[in-house]
Every structure is written in structure tokens, then in C-alpha cells.
């Protein structure tokens, strides 16, 4: 009887521990410069990611993956007037890039995403 | 990093669900004590002992909140420190860490300071209520409202009202059930019942008013309800809320009869309240899952239309012929990688890396594979429902129906994830890193557990009353799991169309579990009716599975 009760409690604990899953995005990327799968000319470029909710800019991250697969963490400009944006700058050469972003919404939810884009030779 | 963030999201929803349960029970218990039991305790037989029991429950709830919130905050802090590379002192200044710390402190104060002495002193009682209020304020800081771009103040008040309503009603029910269990005096039951009815009505009013406002601001229009994951989850919450209202109405009629001094089915009220706790906690886990998806109003593209839902659900004959494993996208990709590697004379990489965060590739044969799985699962579940009904009608041999669950579990274990052993190349242990594979395996474990328990109970191998309750509890928990289970499908629309089928399955699972609970716990006509309801729910689940389409 006692063993059975312990087993019931254990089963319920296991079941409760898996009772919920949901790894979907919370902060939604509404707009960006560069656009996803878009193209832009080489040179010093402004990077802007605009979300649906306020973002903790100091605790979010932008990592630029260059065509040679090297990774650079971009410095995010804190701007209280644009609380839903992650802004930065980068010097880009022609090739295929991916911007890995991780945003901490002000309500504590972490969201990550990738932004692939192409840099063309400057005209 | 991808695996860490995915695992973080997985665990954080679980912990958030536990936080909501503990928080609601703590606040509900506190309000129950301050506004119901303490004022009535001198009028009730053994009022002091009853108060002591509810005090203990509330203190345990506060301890639970302390631990759950500590774990949730620690997990978030760890995830942030390791992915962004910030020091602990910096991360602890993030708003979620501040509100988490505030909730931990409040829970600790209530766990340590709530006792008969503090409850008896008006100043101390008010201070405890203030600590409860601070908990609620801190909790609203981790809701969608805090991060919204517009209408922050209004939405924060509304979120607070919603949580207050849930606490005073659903969070108060465990205290109510505890009192019902130990109070046998008719007049006392009438007093407690009618006062708790009034508190519940206040809770329902708060939930209803705040819920309507949140629907306006977070969902916006009808398509937001059926066309987005957020809307579908809110619809499921509304369905369960309506079920709670029906049960609450049943209990209200009992308290009214008691108040008028007439005979009333008090045991039914207790059993209904137990079911209310179960459904209420399921709603809390749905709410925890809801906080991890963006509000419907923010999703302007990738919404599902009614036409797409109608096309997807057009009647078609179930698929009982499986495609060949070699025709699946993952197998074909592996063949291609092997060929390329052989050409370059190097080791071939695996077509899929568990836990990489990348959804596996899919083609038409993968869809046929998944539909075949669902349709055969539907056959199993229809048979289970039919045999359970036959058994209910007195056919003796049909009592072995739970063994079908073991066959179903074996079938799912082999076929759910074709990229994993025994059919695929992926190692059994390495596949645990994949969140979806882990969920499937835990579902299988759950099915085995409730199959074994129910068969042992029905064949007399287990005679304990508690053992009989394992089946309904695990079925209800399985329904809750399914409600918040998501599929890793790259196409957002396809993913939602799958969720649209799984949500009614989950609700039928929750209904099946709790009606079987009532059959076991409620003697008389109510229990007999419930005895026919749950096999009918299983039949419904089976039919929905047979109807299931992924394209």
C-alpha cells in the first residue's frame, strides 16, 4: 500500500514535470535592416531589429556570422526612445551573412532567431 | 546555444506552471483564511482545528511558491548568463530577476509568519494581505502586459485582476475542499459554502472582465482566435473555464439548499470541487504555456484562414498503409550525405543532430507516415472506448481493455520518431536531447503507466482505492500535456493546423480523466453518468485521430 502510494506520487511528479511545453517565439521580429534573405551593398551598415514588445537591450545579443563562418558579437546601442529595437552597426564585405539574435523581452522571455542576408559589392 | 535556449524554454514553462499553481494556492488560502475561515471559526465546531489545517496548507503553498520561483528565476538567470555572457550581478538587475526575487521574499514571509497568532491580530493580518498584494504586483511584471508597447498601465491592472480572480476562486478551492472534508455540521457547511460562493463569484467576475479586455487587446478579431497558436490556446482556456462554471453552478445549488436548511448532496459538492481543482490547474499550465507565445494581435502574417481549416479537415478515408522508411526525407537526406561523403572520401555527417534546434526535413512521405501513426492510434483508442463501454454494460472479458494501451505505447515508441532507433540511425540516448522526442517518450511512459495501473485495478491485482485513481489522474495529465505540446514544424501555418486538431484531443483527454475520477469518487447517479461519459470521450478522441490530416 505504502509502496503503491509512493509510486503514484512519483508517477504524478514525472507527469507534472512534463505537463507543459512551449518553446515558441515570444518577441516577434516585426521589421529589420537588413531584411531576412535580403541584399545590401558592402560598407559600414546600420543594423536595426524591431520587435513587437519592449526589449531589455543591455541583456540581449547580436552575433554576426561572416561568410568565412567567423563570429562577431555586435555592440548594441541602448536607446530608451526605441525600447522595442536592437540597433547596432557593422562593416560588411560581399558574401552571405547570418545574424543570430537573442532578445530578452522586458517580461523575462528569451527568444532567439536567425536573419540570413547577402552583401553585394558596393556600386 | 540553441539547445540551451530550447531546453530553457521547455523547463521554464513547466516551472512557470508550478509557480502559478503555488502562487494561486498561497493567495487563495490567505484570502480564504482572512475573509472566510477566521471570521467564521468561532461559529464552527472545531473551528480552530479547521483554521490550523488551512494555515498549514497555505504555508506549504507559500513554501512551494518559494521553491518554484527560486528554480524558475535561477533557470532564467543561468540561461541568460551563459548565452549572453553577463555577470550574475548584472543579470540580477533584469526586471524578471527583480520581480522573481520579490516573489521569493514574499513567499518566504508568508511561509514563516502565517500562523494563528498573526491571523488573529488585525494589523498583522493586514500586513500579510499586503505581502500577498505585493506578490500579485510582482507576478504581473512577468506577464505580456509589462513588455507591451502601448496601454501598459491598463494591461498591467487587467493582468493583476486576472491573477487575483484565479487566486480567490481556483486557488481557494483546495482550502474549501479541506474544510468540506473535516466539517460535518449542516449549519457550518451552509455558512462556509455560501461565503465561498460569494468569493468565487467575485473571482469569476474578475476573470471574466479581465479576460474580455485581454481578448480585445491581445487577440483583436475572430481570426486571431482560430488562426493563431495564442488564440487557439485561449479558446481552450475558455472551454475549460466554462466547464468550471458548470461545476461551480452545481456547487452553488448545493450551498443554496444548505442555506435554506434543506437536504443537499454535500459529497457531490466536494467531488465537484476536486474536479474543479484539476481543471483549474490544467488552465494554469495552459496559461504558463500561453506566456511563451506572442499575442495573436502581433501576428499579422502566417495566420490560418477558415478555408485552410476546412480544406485540411475535408473527410478522407484513414490511411492504413505506411510509406517505406527509405522514402522519408531524413532517410533520403542521409543517403545523399553518405554519397557525397564517399565521393570526397570522408566520414558522412548525420542528417539530423538532436537538440540542434533545427526542425527535421519533411516531405509528402513524412506526412503520410505521421497520418498513418495517428490513424492507427485512433483505431486503438476507439477499441478502448468501445470495450470500456461493453465492460460498463457488464461484459466481463472486456475488462482487459487497458492492455490495448500497452500495444499503443509500443506502436508509438517505434514509429513516433522515425529518425531515431530502432527505425532510424539516431542513437536512443542521444535523441533525448531532442525536446520533441523527449516529449513523445514521456507520453509513451504515461500511456504504459495508466494502462498497467488500470488493468491491475480492473483484474483485482491492485485493490487500493488510491491505485484506481492513477488512471484518471494520468489521463487528465496526459490531456494537459497534449494541450501544451508543440510540434517542430518549420512552417508556422502547418504547425498551427496540427495544433488545431490536438487541442480538442487534449480537452477530451482532460474531460475523460476527470469524469472517470467522478465515477470512482461519486456514488449514485452522478457517478454512473460519469461512467458513460469517459468512454464516450475516448471514442471521440479515437474518431478525431482517425480524422487527422497533416496536408
Residue ranges and their predicted role:
Chain B
Residues 1-368, 390-401, 451, 455-460, ...:
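Polytopic transmembrane helical bundles with strong interfacial aromatic enrichment
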Residues 165-166, 170, 466-487, 497-518, ...:
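Alpha-helical membrane segments in multi-pass integral membrane proteins
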Residues 112, 407-420, 432, 460-461, ...:
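Alpha-helical transmembrane segments and their helix-helix packing motifs
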Residues 353-368, 381, 404-411, 419-434, ...:
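Short, flexible domain-boundary/linker segments around small modular repeats
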Residues 71-88, 414-435:
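Helix-loop junctions on the outward
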Residues 96-105, 372-379, 439-445, 500-507:
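Structural signature of hydrophobic alpha-helical transmembrane segments
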Residues 225-227, 367-371, 393-398, 423-442, ...:
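Membrane-helix interface and helix-disruption motif detector
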